[in-house]
Amino acid sequence: MSKIPVLEIFGPTIQGEGMVVGQKTMFIRTAGCDYSCAWCDSAFTWDGSAKDQIRQMTPEDIWDELVAIGGENFSHVTISGGNPALLKNIEFLLSILKENGMRTAIETQGSKWQDWLLQIDEITISPKPPSSTMKTDFQRLDAIIQKLAGKDISLKVVVFDDHDFEYAVKMHERYPKVPFFLQVGNDDTKTVDDAMLIKKLLDKYEWLIDKAVNCKEMNDAKVLPQLHALVWGNKRGV
């Protein structure tokens, strides 16, 4: 059976972002991404800085480690990255998770399609705004969202500035029937000064709330902070 490149397995913790914010979950963080966002808070998944930490693991190995770490204290697993949608062989892992009664979630930027996405319970698609310096392939994104029709999906846009907010408005208008989340961006992913970081993030959150409540196009949007950053700062593995 083919192996999966894994950088981290951790939890139980709570999901800090998007449609399942606050959900108690275990995390599987895979290596590799087809993007290189300017402000990426998990650049170690693709920039080579953590290449010595990558483990090639079978789905059985991953499940065994989830249980070893989480015991009986979880029923939800989040697959994160990087971009886990780069990997073709996640379906075997999903089968094991389902056999053991797990609900599953994933976040991907909507740049790659895999048939196994249809097996995921909660799918967050997070297209990257202008501040990321990445370009959205809307034709590909259209196709992916169409294939996921009827699934429990959402769109999430991280917002750093006015240009990002304008991008978010256009995204929401393009897919008005897909639940939509605005989220504060963290542009200081290296600091260990948690008090300073929390103040910055809360100031940004207040700014984003003000933008949203004064924009009629965002009447149905939900505005979120980065919950995990407010609790743990930039700490990994939480």
UniProtKB/Swiss-Prot annotation:
Keywords: 4Fe-4S, Iron, Iron-sulfur, Lyase, Magnesium, Metal-binding, Queuosine biosynthesis, S-adenosyl-L-methionine. It holds the Pfam family Radical_SAM. The keyword tRNA processing does not apply. Its EC number is 4.3.99.3. Mg(2+) binds at S42. It is an enzyme of class 4 (lyase). Binds 1 [4Fe-4S] cluster. The cluster is coordinated with 3 cysteines and an exchangeable S-adenosyl-L-methionine. The keyword 4Fe-4S applies. One of its GO terms (molecular function) is carbon-nitrogen lyase activity. It comes from the Bacteria. GO terms for biological process: queuosine biosynthetic process. [4Fe-4S] cluster binds at C33, C37, C40. InterPro entries: 7-CO-7-deazaguanine_synth-like, Aldolase_TIM, Deazaguanine_synth, rSAM. Pathway: Purine metabolism; 7-cyano-7-deazaguanine biosynthesis. It catalyses: 6-carboxy-5,6,7,8-tetrahydropterin + H(+) = 7-carboxy-7-deazaguanine + NH4(+). Substrate binds at I14, Q15, G16, R29, S80. Its cofactor is [4Fe-4S] cluster; S-adenosyl-L-methionine; Mg(2+). S-adenosyl-L-methionine binds at G82, S126, P127, K128. Residues 20-234 form the Radical SAM core domain. Homodimer. Belongs to the radical SAM superfamily. 7-carboxy-7-deazaguanine synthase family. PANTHER family: 7-CARBOXY-7-DEAZAGUANINE SYNTHASE. Catalyzes the complex heterocyclic radical-mediated conversion of 6-carboxy-5,6,7,8-tetrahydropterin (CPH4) to 7-carboxy-7-deazaguanine (CDG), a step common to the biosynthetic pathways of all 7-deazapurine-containing compounds. This is 7-carboxy-7-deazaguanine synthase. It comes from Bacillus cereus (strain ATCC 14579 / DSM 31 / CCUG 7414 / JCM 2152 / NBRC 15305 / NCIMB 9373 / NCTC 2599 / NRRL B-3711).
